[in-house]
Amino acid sequence: MKIILTSLYMKLDFYKYQGTGNDFILLDSRKKKVENSFLFKKLCDRHFGIGADGIILIQNDDKYKSDFYMKYCNSDGKESTMCGNGGRCAVSFAKKLGITKKNKIHFRAIDGYHNGFIIDNLVSINMMNIDRNTIKIHSKYVFLNTGSPHHILFLEEENIKEKNVYEEGKNIRFQNPYFEKGVNVNFVKILENDTLQVRTYERGVENETLSCGTGVVASVIAACETNKIKNNVKDIKDILVQTLGGKLWVSLTKTKKEYKNVSLTGNVQLIFEGSIFIDKDWLNL
């Protein structure tokens, strides 16, 4: 069943989650299929809607033998690439919906299959393997794709807290070679004990977010690839990454050809749930 606004209003049940400050509206779309990018944009509006960095739809995926399919749309309402923190929230939401009673879940997203694990209030998901030949190291930045494209800038002397992430990120986002497709821009500071601080400008949100899961993973891999952390270490466990929204941990295995066994772990919280009555007049605001 596809929801179409043919009446004065419709009722939409929703769940608001956050993963290290990256917040999302989650919708159970297994029976009622919701496909309306303008609606999604309105729902994500922090002044006239519920407010969120993006929308996550949980859909049936029986054909591909996974527990569910995760469809992700940015706050601009458009379907986007993989969202790491969104994936962690989707795993927690799927458990709440009763899709599984176990603390392990198998799901599919735009970039392929993922496994998710729930341990108390922490949720971990495995991420795609990264072919080291696809990582582009330039004199001033590193580019790689961890399910979403990321531009990594390492800060040496600069104070990351004073960085104007919005202005600088926006300027890089559409620059050559990215143009209209854009890129996520990460500013990274290496601290003691191989700890990272990361701030991210996200395309589609068109602003800095409190945390970006794929950006955190990309930052750790870029730091490993440029030998800024864990030089000559094969199995890398629980690299701590500090974001504005909290702490995340990244683990991975580094081989000659690729980074594999990549996992992203952090907190997930159901903030609230409710129902919104969507009036046609509201959509036309």
Residue ranges and their predicted role:
Residues I4-D120, I152-L285:
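A glycine-rich beta-to-alpha transition motif near the start of alpha/beta enzyme domains, typified by
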Residues N126-S139, E167-K170:
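Active-site glycine-rich loop that binds ribose-phosphate moieties when present
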